[in-house]
Amino acid sequence: MKLILNLITAGSLLVALAPAQPRYTVADLGAFPGGNSSAGYGINNAGWVTGCSNLTPGGPLQSFIWYGIGPLIEIPTLGGPGGCADGPNAFGEAAIISATSKPPYMNEAFCGLTGASGDQNQCLAAVWKNGRLTALPTLPGGHNSQTYWLNNLGQVVGFSENGISDPTCATGTPYQVLRFEGVIWGPDGEVRELRPLEGDTTGFAWGINDHGQAVGSSGLCSNTSVSGPVGPTAPHAVLWDRDGSPTDLGHLEGVPAGVYNVATSINDRGDVVGFAQASDGTQHGFLWTKETGMQDIGGFPGAGNGTGAPCCNTINNTGEIVGFSIDANFNFRALVWQDKMPIDLNTLIPADSPLYLTGSESLNDSGQITGTAIVKSSCPVTTPPAWQTNQSLCTETHAFVATPCFP
């Protein structure tokens, strides 16, 4: 799961529209009553959306599912003050991360659901199925786990602590004590370890396809983070085959090993997308195929602090890609890729939209996109608009669904 509200934008190169390129209508999904912030993280082929919203401004996030009409439906937690949902699959099942009522182990801040580092409850991976939330087991000795995605077979991917204390964890992952590894749960709830690459000690799985192939990253606890502006990061992008054997997906051409490379999504053809750090320190989206290896599919030059480039979140079974970018001032922008080039999704929606789209998190095989948007009316009146150049001044964000339409 792309935890927590890691929504992103960047100013720079925008691509001219091709005549056959779709435009989009946008539906505002709102937030829970009393809340001011929501995000859509997954959308299935029926147009159902999962994500999370707060119940009060600044309050903890709570999982939701939206069935294409009506309000957001709240999904309960495992007893703690927060949760977030990914998926859903074709059957409406969702991958959940949920806080429990237990205090954090050794003051760890593994989840990012309820507040500042060191002020966390235990969190566990769970699955929402047939109207019930069921906790999934951790690896032996682990206290915390997270989910990121699930497939139509009911397999869920994420990562779990494994009970091994590592004093180097606090260097790369503040408030983390135990190592963690990528895992697959299910389809019957059992947990299976996804071992990191040889020489690595930690890892996480971010995506899975309907063939049971999973993707994510691995590294050392000293250079792997469980959370950050773009989610967890580690040096090596990894593809795990159905039998759990890992493959190193490499790095962008000309970039030395050791910077982060994160695989986020894999479609049923085995194509993988993610983000990687380039030699100039900027972040670039990538597409990996078995035939071509890792290809750079666009960066936004000009934000030389290492944050000013796109992140690919999801690739669907037709090869469409969505994501987001962030500029040097931490302003976010939703992206969709056309011909391997990132396009600002805001240029493809009605100009008078009340929303400014800040993050494209997922899309289905019909090209519908969900993510997060700023409510323009929650921003002060400035020139240029605050929703583009000073987003921290805006006070309300909503989940959205963008549906393609052709001229």
Residue ranges with predicted function:
Residues 3-5, 11, 17-407:
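Residue-level hotspots at or immediately adjacent to binding/recognition sites across diverse folds
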